[in-house]
Amino acid sequence: MKKLFVMSFTVLFSLFLAVPAFAGEEPQNLDDLSNLGEIIYQDDEITVRDFGNDPVISNIITEDPNSVIAEENAGIKPQVVGPGGRAVVTAGDYGRTIYWTVRPNTLWPYHFEGKVKLRYYSGFKRDAPVGGMGALGSSLSGAVHMNKNNGGYATLTGTAYSLDFSKYKVLPGAGTSF
């Protein structure tokens, strides 16, 4: 029991210390997000950025009129019913950047592991690894920037693992054209 408490306290404490630092100006729209966040993977074709659990960035992605939201009561936007929480995917920067955000249905700290599956109309396929840690009902966000856009479809898949040993899968249907 003591080990579980110490491990939980350490993980929870580390989540509050690992908050990414952003510039003084807060972003207002998707175009402002293009150079924010920490680069976690980069090659000749794509750049993957992690925005952490900043609620401002999550709201910008969610409130974009072109966002595809997968949650139980998504309103007029496309919806998929499921108990896992909320996943939002939208394209920005003329289809060259895929923004994503997830919010599992848990109040426990969680670790999210996932992929943005890029399926180009030319037949080329590419998976970009995404993920991070979130705490106490927060959202986690990121972006995948493509150096070239030949058109296609992006799908977000993945699972959030909480400290109470529960799994929260991204609902099917969280995807968008780019």
Positions of the model-derived regions?
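N-terminal prepro-regions of secreted/extracellular proteins
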Residues: 1-91
